[in-house]
Structure formats: structure tokens, C-alpha cells
Amino acid sequence: MTAVAASSRVSDPLAASSSAHPRTLRSSPRKRTTSHDSSISPSAAQSKQLPRRKKPRTELVDESELDCAACPAVGQPAPTPGKGAASDRETWICCTHCKTWFHCICIGLENPDDFSKWYCQPCITRSEQTFESGTSSSHPPFANVVRPPRRKSERAKLQIDYAAIQEGIPADPLGRWKNLLNAYEFEPDQFRRMQGHEWTFDWLLHDESALKQPVLVPAPPDRSSQAPHVQAKAEDVAASPVPRPKPARAKKQATHRLVPCHTSIPGMVVPPPEMSIFDVADIIGHDTPVEVIDVASQSSSKASWTISEWAEYFNTPKEKKKKTLNVISLEVTGTPMQAYVEAPQLVRDLDWVTRDWPAERRDASCSENSWPKVQRYVLMGVEGAYSDWHIDFAGSSVYYHVIWGQKTFLFAPPTARNLAAYKAWCSSTRQDFDWLGDHLHSLTRVDIGPGETMLIPSGWLHCVYTPKNTLVVGGNFLTDWNVATQWKLVEIEEATKVPRKFRFPHLKRLSWFVAKGWNDRLEPLAEFETLTKEEDQVLEESAQVSAQVDVGSLTEVVPPLKVLNNIELVLQSLSDDLELIQDPYVAESGDERKVKQQKAAREAIPTHHVGNIQKAEAMLASLRQRVDRAKSLADAVQSERVCLTWEATRAKKAKAANGSAIKSRKARR
């Protein structure tokens, strides 16, 4: 899933420019300036009397202020590096004796790391002349000292990306993240475990904690037992050295071999556990472009990737991978892969896009970016992949299902303190070095295995580690139940200048469709818009509501009070936009930011569904009246729901008891 600052952190901070400082192959110029003074050391007697002096700390050398003593004069040809030699003017070496600095290319030096002591030619010549003249018998002539070869080890070596280090990315960030996960003491995992069949609308209506904390649906017992075997089989097939069949044939075979699976959660469809990454490529098309994240920098890879190339990389042995990469934003709606990914029915009932965005404006004939396609993601992470701290765009909620592999989540609740720390961190230039977890409270670790599904509510901060190759499906959705948190996260995105690419697409237009949808759904309350003040006052007294209104007929019309309060937040946001659109002083003010906001607000109104500005204003006024009426009825309607639920539960128990009694009588016969 796309993340904000994600990243999601998908919207990652720009790394420091690599052109600001020259690159050295050795770790630091400080290590090359060790003094080898020729002064005679004190005698043994003196050393007993005098305290040992500490070696003075060598000052850091700013290479941008250095001058090369061997650079060719102006007009002279530039030196040509030999085979394997440093080919730029950003690799330096310092003479151990005179402390003069040289470009390696100017002196034809291949690799400065080959020497533990290196002397420039003038120093070597002078030392030879002095030694031959006999004026100094204490020291032999200077000679370069080659480093002894390192002892070879059969251990896998960490591939250090020097270019990444030069750009401000810390060394071994992958190992650092893994160490943080293993070293921290987290809060006990007390998130609720639910059965799949419990993911219903009744859960939201009767559980005050619903959509406030993450919940996990464990894998069915049969799925858990076969998961390791099936995962290994899928990876073996994908990594097999046998040549892959042609794309068209492979696609046909995959379609017949792989059958979408239904989970224990009503309405949810996921790929079968034997699906490999090559199968994904076969299904959606080998030339389909994918955005690949470089885990070390937490930013998009500069190279262009196709899903076929990604499948080859994914199944390359770990020791042969030069970089750790990740795919977290492959949306498959409108592709053949859509048949394998369907959100739970509860998610579709709550999702603003699925419920309120007109169906004819999000079908296959619509252009790719004309509507918010965020419902069906396929995520593919290799061992060691990591997504830094983020909140999904616009504070959207997430459903997340692991097909095979494992994901390790760290969660932090969206408290005022945590969100303030997150906002400050998103604006910081030291995100790569400053782990946000140090500034958050109530961190909880959750490991999600094959066949398990996680529901992440709006605003929860999280980072994700991949301990083994993993295939995941999931999606994002905005709801009526979390508008306050969603709007708060939108404000943070605006304050931290998150690029538009990493924000929830078409959010303003979607808000208009949501308002239009609720105005239509609350239309049965229109009959109360003509009540007199006296009748309205009676209606607001819950004790007399049932006598005035058939409350039972409104249980499917009037939502809970918390939802009505959130609808009012949507109303207020759209009213502010209308006020901005009709402000005549914006154009005269010369404020470019305000002018752009005014234009965006005007273009967001779906005139084909809402009408012009005057009709949009009238629609909001109508919705406001209906919401007010619904709020006056909400308590009575909720009480009616509780009674109906209690009666249904009692009837169900009675039916079950009667069934047991009948079975007992038959058994006695």
C-alpha cells in the first residue's frame, strides 16, 4: 500500500546531493594523516618519570578545500587513468610524510586502499638522496607499504553501497533496522484476534472499539499446517532453472492451474498459496511496468522495471542480489489479476470509492488515473526488505493478507503526541539516521504469517520488516467512521508538503460523491424537513420519538451518531471549499497558493452529478438538514437496533436448543 511519508514512506525525503563533497574510496581522510614523526622516543628512564601523552586527535579534512599537487597546468591534457584506476577527481590520497594531497587519477594510482603507508615521489626521492649521502643513518628510504591480503572467509559478505553512503544514506541500514526490531522492548500484543465470520457490519454497530485498533484474523488450521510446504513449493517452482514458457502460453496455463481462494472473511478473495511471482507476471502481462523501491534509500529505483524483470530479481539467490528492493504499489484493478484480489464485503461496504464513486466512472473504459484505484494491491518483498515509518495516505485504513512468507509490523497509535512526533520527523532532513520509533510511545510488534489477515484502522503509524520472501495482497479505503483522523492526516500531508503523487487520488472529488451519496440515503428523512418548531422539539426528545416516528423503519437509514458527526466534518470541508470558490478577493490578492487552491476546489466539483456551484450549495444545505434530523433520531434508532439484535440472538439460541432436543430424542429412539 502506498504510504505517506511515506511511504509510504513512499514519499521519501530527498537525499543530500552527492556533488557537494568528493568521494574517497577509503573511509575518511582522517585515517590517512597519521603522523610518523622521526623524532627519537624518550628513554626508558624518562618514560617511567613522564606521563604518557595522548596521541592528538587528527582534525577532519574538508576535501573540497584541498588542492592536488599533481594536477596538470591549464591547457595541458588531462591524465588518462589506467585499467582499474580511479577515473574521477573525487578520489584522493595523502602522503604519509609531507601530508600533501593528490588526485589518484593525476598520479596514476589504481586504488589507495591497497596501501597502509603511501609516500609521494618527491618525498621518496629526497629520502633516498639523504640515505645515500650518509647524513641520516637512522631511517631507510621511504617506501610504500602494501596492505597484507585479508584472511578469506566463507561467510556471506555485506555489499556496502558506497554511492548510497555518499548520498547521505547510513551504512548497513538493513542490518540496523533488523537490530532495532530485535533489541527494542515492545508493548505486549493485545490486539484482538477475530474469526473471519465476525467481520460484519453488526461488529461496527455494536462494538465501540471497532475500527479503533488493529485486529488480526488468524489462518484457518488447515491453512497453517500446509503453509510452509506450499510456500516452499511455490518458491521452488519460481526459482527453477527450467526455461520459462512463452508468455502467452504461460498465461493460459496459469489461468487453468491457479484458482482464486475464498477466505473465512465474508466476500474476500485472495490468490492460492501456490502462486509464485512468475505466475503474477504471467497473469498481468510480462511487460507491465512496476515501481520498485530501493530499500536502503527508501525511494523509488531510478531504473525502469517490468514485472518480468522483477520476477527474475525476486527469485535470484539472496547472496547474488546487489541491492534489497521492494514492490509495494502494484495496483491490479482492471487487469486479469483482479480476479484473484477482492476486498472483504465489510471493507467494500465501508469504502467511499466502492460505495459512492459512480460505477460508470470507474470501469475498464475509464482512463487509468481518472478515479482512485487503491482497492487491490499486490505487494512482493524479498528477505530483508523494510518500509520505514509511515501512515497510509489520507489516513486511509488498510486490509492486509499474507499469501506466503511473513511480515513483521511495528504499530503506534495515532495519539496527539505520536502524530506530533511523526509530523516533525517527516519535516526532518535526518530521517535516514533518526529512527522515529525512539520518539513514539506504545509500540507493539505483530508478526503476520501465511493465511492471516490484518485490518489496520485509520491513522495508525507502522513500519514493516520482511524476514523472508513474501507475497501479500491488500488495499486502502476511507470510511465514514474515521473522518476526524483522516482529515487530520490530510493536514499533516499538506503541512509537510507530501508530493501529490503520494496522496490519496481525487480526494476532494470523492468527498463530493460521499456527500451526494449520503443526501440520497437520508432522503427518507425529508418528510421531517417541514416540521414546525414545536414538532421538532418533541422529535428531539428521545422518550417521545417512538410515538411520533416508526423507528423500526429507520434502522437501515439512520447511521450511528459517530458516523453522523463525521459526515458533518465532510460537510464543513466542502462548505469551506465553496466559500473559497466564491471569494472574489482571492484573484486580487496575488496569493498564488490561494489561487491554486481555489482552482482545485472548483475543478473538484463533479458537475455531471452535483450540478453547478448553486446546486452544489443547495445539496449541502439539504444534507445538513437531514443530518440534523438523523442526529435527533440516532439514539432511539440505536436502541431499536440493540433490541432487534437481542431478539435475533435469543431466537437463534432457541432454534439451536430445539435442534439439539430433536437430535437427542432421535438418538434415544
Curated annotation (Swiss-Prot):
Superkingdom assignment: Eukaryota
Coiled-coil intervals: none
Gene Ontology MF terms: histone demethylase activity; histone H3K36me/H3K36me2 demethylase activity; transcription coregulator activity; zinc ion binding
Stored SUPFAM superfamilies: Clavaminate synthase-like, FYVE/PHD zinc finger
Main enzyme class: oxidoreductase
InterPro entries: Cupin_8 (IPR041667), JHD (IPR041070), JHDM1_Histone_Demethylase (IPR050690), JmjC_dom (IPR003347), Zinc_finger_PHD-type_CS (IPR019786), Znf_FYVE_PHD (IPR011011)
Record's compositionally biased regions (Basic residues): 246-255
Domain JmjC: 332-494
Key words of the record: Chromatin regulator, Dioxygenase, Iron, Metal-binding, Nucleus, Oxidoreductase, Transcription, Transcription regulation, Zinc, Zinc-finger
A biological process from GO: chromatin remodeling
Compartment(s) where it occurs, according to its Swiss-Prot or TrEMBL record: Nucleus
A single cellular component GO annotation: nucleus
Stretches annotated zinc finger (PHD-type): 65-126
Residues holding substrate: K407
Cofactors required: Fe(2+)
Reactions it catalyzes: N(6),N(6)-dimethyl-L-lysyl(36)-[histone H3] + 2 2-oxoglutarate + 2 O2 = L-lysyl(36)-[histone H3] + 2 formaldehyde + 2 succinate + 2 CO2
Residues involved in Fe cation binding: H390, D392, H462
Domain notes: The JmjC domain mediates the demethylation activity.
Role of this protein: Histone demethylase that specifically demethylates 'Lys-36' of histone H3, thereby playing a central role in histone code.
Family: Belongs to the JHDM1 histone demethylase family.
Protein name, as recorded: JmjC domain-containing histone demethylation protein 1
Gene: JHD1
